[in-house]
Amino acid sequence: MELSGVTLSINGLACGLKSVGGHRITFVAPPFISSSTSGTIYPIVITKGGAVLKTFVTIVPTRPDIFNSAMTVAPLGRAKIFNSTNTVLTSEPFVIRTIKRKGHTLTATRLRLYLTGIQNVSAGVVSIRIGSVVINGSGIASDNVLVDPGVQTIDFLLPATLQGMGNQPIILTVTANGVTFESRLDDTSTKLFIL
Protein backbone atom coordinates (compact mmCIF):
# COMPACT_ATOMS: atom_id res chain seq x y z
CA MET A 1 0.00 0.00 0.00
CA GLU A 2 1.34 3.42 -0.95
CA LEU A 3 0.39 6.89 0.25
CA SER A 4 2.07 10.10 -0.99
CA GLY A 5 4.82 7.99 -2.57
CA VAL A 6 5.62 6.25 0.74
CA THR A 7 5.45 2.53 1.49
CA LEU A 8 6.09 0.82 4.82
CA SER A 9 6.52 -2.86 5.64
CA ILE A 10 7.20 -4.84 8.81
CA ASN A 11 9.00 -8.16 8.34
CA GLY A 12 8.09 -8.03 4.64
CA LEU A 13 4.36 -7.50 5.31
CA ALA A 14 2.78 -4.31 3.93
CA CYS A 15 1.33 -1.91 6.49
CA GLY A 16 -1.80 0.18 6.00
CA LEU A 17 -0.84 3.85 5.84
CA LYS A 18 -3.31 6.30 7.38
CA SER A 19 -1.31 9.52 7.01
CA VAL A 20 2.15 10.70 5.98
CA GLY A 21 3.63 13.96 7.26
CA GLY A 22 7.04 15.61 7.20
CA HIS A 23 8.25 13.81 10.34
CA ARG A 24 5.49 11.32 11.08
CA ILE A 25 3.83 8.30 9.50
CA THR A 26 0.62 6.94 10.98
CA PHE A 27 0.17 3.29 10.03
CA VAL A 28 -1.69 0.14 10.97
CA ALA A 29 0.44 -2.93 11.64
CA PRO A 30 -0.38 -6.04 9.60
CA PRO A 31 -3.08 -8.13 11.30
CA PHE A 32 -2.00 -11.32 13.04
CA ILE A 33 1.69 -10.37 13.20
CA SER A 34 2.95 -12.54 16.05
CA SER A 35 4.78 -11.40 19.15
CA SER A 36 6.06 -12.68 22.46
CA THR A 37 4.75 -11.02 25.63
CA SER A 38 8.06 -9.21 26.10
CA GLY A 39 7.95 -7.97 22.49
CA THR A 40 9.42 -9.22 19.22
CA ILE A 41 11.84 -7.17 17.13
CA TYR A 42 11.08 -7.07 13.40
CA PRO A 43 12.78 -5.26 10.50
CA ILE A 44 10.85 -2.26 9.19
CA VAL A 45 11.44 -0.77 5.73
CA ILE A 46 10.21 2.67 4.66
CA THR A 47 10.56 3.75 1.03
CA LYS A 48 9.90 7.12 -0.60
CA GLY A 49 10.81 8.03 -4.13
CA GLY A 50 13.62 5.49 -4.39
CA ALA A 51 15.09 6.29 -0.94
CA VAL A 52 15.01 3.34 1.47
CA LEU A 53 15.20 3.53 5.27
CA LYS A 54 15.75 0.23 7.10
CA THR A 55 15.49 -0.05 10.87
CA PHE A 56 13.75 -2.17 13.51
CA VAL A 57 10.47 -2.00 15.42
CA THR A 58 9.35 -3.90 18.52
CA ILE A 59 5.87 -5.42 18.30
CA VAL A 60 4.02 -6.38 21.51
CA PRO A 61 0.88 -8.59 21.66
CA THR A 62 -1.40 -5.63 22.32
CA ARG A 63 -1.07 -1.91 22.94
CA PRO A 64 -4.53 -0.77 23.99
CA ASP A 65 -5.53 2.87 24.01
CA ILE A 66 -8.76 4.87 23.99
CA PHE A 67 -9.69 7.46 21.39
CA ASN A 68 -10.75 10.87 22.64
CA SER A 69 -13.77 12.75 21.30
CA ALA A 70 -11.61 14.26 18.51
CA MET A 71 -10.76 10.68 17.36
CA THR A 72 -7.09 11.01 18.28
CA VAL A 73 -5.13 8.86 20.67
CA ALA A 74 -3.74 11.43 23.07
CA PRO A 75 -3.64 12.10 26.79
CA LEU A 76 -6.56 13.71 28.60
CA GLY A 77 -9.79 14.93 27.00
CA ARG A 78 -13.18 13.22 26.82
CA ALA A 79 -13.40 9.56 25.81
CA LYS A 80 -15.03 8.70 22.47
CA ILE A 81 -17.89 6.78 24.06
CA PHE A 82 -21.63 6.53 23.50
CA ASN A 83 -24.70 5.01 25.14
CA SER A 84 -25.54 2.19 22.70
CA THR A 85 -28.48 0.69 24.62
CA ASN A 86 -30.85 1.87 21.88
CA THR A 87 -30.47 2.34 18.12
CA VAL A 88 -29.63 6.05 18.41
CA LEU A 89 -26.25 6.56 20.09
CA THR A 90 -26.18 9.28 22.76
CA SER A 91 -23.23 11.02 24.41
CA GLU A 92 -22.38 11.82 28.02
CA PRO A 93 -23.38 12.40 30.74
CA PHE A 94 -24.41 8.78 31.28
CA VAL A 95 -26.78 7.14 33.75
CA ILE A 96 -26.35 3.58 34.99
CA ARG A 97 -29.77 2.46 33.74
CA THR A 98 -31.50 3.29 30.45
CA ILE A 99 -35.04 2.69 29.20
CA LYS A 100 -34.96 0.42 26.13
CA ARG A 101 -37.14 1.74 23.31
CA LYS A 102 -38.20 -1.79 22.39
CA GLY A 103 -40.13 -3.19 25.33
CA HIS A 104 -39.90 -0.03 27.46
CA THR A 105 -37.87 -1.80 30.15
CA LEU A 106 -35.25 -0.27 32.43
CA THR A 107 -31.93 -2.00 31.82
CA ALA A 108 -28.22 -1.57 32.57
CA THR A 109 -26.74 1.08 30.29
CA ARG A 110 -24.64 -0.34 27.46
CA LEU A 111 -21.72 1.90 26.45
CA ARG A 112 -19.68 1.69 23.22
CA LEU A 113 -16.01 2.70 23.58
CA TYR A 114 -13.70 3.50 20.64
CA LEU A 115 -10.26 1.88 20.97
CA THR A 116 -7.09 0.95 19.18
CA GLY A 117 -4.47 -1.74 19.70
CA ILE A 118 -6.86 -4.58 20.52
CA GLN A 119 -7.39 -6.26 17.16
CA ASN A 120 -7.49 -10.07 17.49
CA VAL A 121 -8.17 -9.79 21.25
CA SER A 122 -11.19 -11.58 22.74
CA ALA A 123 -13.48 -10.00 25.33
CA GLY A 124 -12.37 -12.62 27.88
CA VAL A 125 -8.98 -10.94 28.38
CA VAL A 126 -10.30 -7.35 28.43
CA SER A 127 -11.26 -5.31 31.47
CA ILE A 128 -12.35 -1.69 31.73
CA ARG A 129 -11.78 0.37 34.86
CA ILE A 130 -13.80 3.51 35.52
CA GLY A 131 -12.40 5.25 38.60
CA SER A 132 -11.90 2.35 41.01
CA VAL A 133 -14.62 0.08 39.56
CA VAL A 134 -13.45 -2.77 37.29
CA ILE A 135 -15.77 -4.14 34.60
CA ASN A 136 -14.90 -7.55 33.13
CA GLY A 137 -16.39 -10.97 32.41
CA SER A 138 -20.12 -10.71 31.66
CA GLY A 139 -19.87 -6.92 32.03
CA ILE A 140 -18.04 -6.83 28.68
CA ALA A 141 -21.00 -7.09 26.29
CA SER A 142 -19.18 -7.65 22.98
CA ASP A 143 -15.92 -8.71 21.42
CA ASN A 144 -14.08 -5.90 19.70
CA VAL A 145 -15.58 -4.80 16.40
CA LEU A 146 -13.41 -3.37 13.61
CA VAL A 147 -14.79 0.03 12.57
CA ASP A 148 -11.86 1.26 10.48
CA PRO A 149 -8.28 0.02 10.14
CA GLY A 150 -6.73 0.55 13.57
CA VAL A 151 -10.08 1.50 15.15
CA GLN A 152 -12.19 -0.96 17.13
CA THR A 153 -15.20 -0.62 19.43
CA ILE A 154 -16.19 -2.68 22.43
CA ASP A 155 -19.49 -2.56 24.32
CA PHE A 156 -19.79 -2.92 28.08
CA LEU A 157 -22.49 -2.59 30.75
CA LEU A 158 -22.39 0.02 33.51
CA PRO A 159 -22.67 -1.58 36.97
CA ALA A 160 -24.84 0.01 39.69
CA THR A 161 -21.71 0.75 41.76
CA LEU A 162 -20.89 3.61 39.35
CA GLN A 163 -24.02 5.62 40.16
CA GLY A 164 -23.16 9.23 40.96
CA MET A 165 -19.41 8.79 40.31
CA GLY A 166 -19.17 11.99 38.24
CA ASN A 167 -16.08 12.73 36.14
CA GLN A 168 -13.85 9.63 36.12
CA PRO A 169 -10.84 8.32 34.17
CA ILE A 170 -11.44 5.27 31.98
CA ILE A 171 -8.65 2.70 31.61
CA LEU A 172 -8.56 -0.30 29.27
CA THR A 173 -6.58 -3.37 30.36
CA VAL A 174 -5.72 -6.43 28.26
CA THR A 175 -4.05 -9.51 29.76
CA ALA A 176 -2.05 -11.61 27.28
CA ASN A 177 -0.28 -14.76 28.50
CA GLY A 178 -0.28 -13.46 32.08
CA VAL A 179 1.14 -10.04 31.15
CA THR A 180 -1.03 -6.95 31.68
CA PHE A 181 -1.10 -4.10 29.15
CA GLU A 182 -2.90 -0.86 30.19
CA SER A 183 -4.02 2.03 28.02
CA ARG A 184 -2.80 4.83 30.32
CA LEU A 185 -2.34 5.91 33.91
CA ASP A 186 -5.25 7.67 35.62
CA ASP A 187 -3.66 11.13 35.42
CA THR A 188 -3.33 11.06 31.60
CA SER A 189 -6.41 9.01 30.72
CA THR A 190 -9.47 10.23 28.87
CA LYS A 191 -12.54 10.72 31.05
CA LEU A 192 -16.30 10.26 31.07
CA PHE A 193 -19.10 11.59 33.29
CA ILE A 194 -21.63 9.38 35.09
CA LEU A 195 -24.65 10.88 36.87
State what each model feature region is.
Residues 1-195:
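A sequence-level detector for low-complexity, Ser/Thr- and acidic-rich stretches
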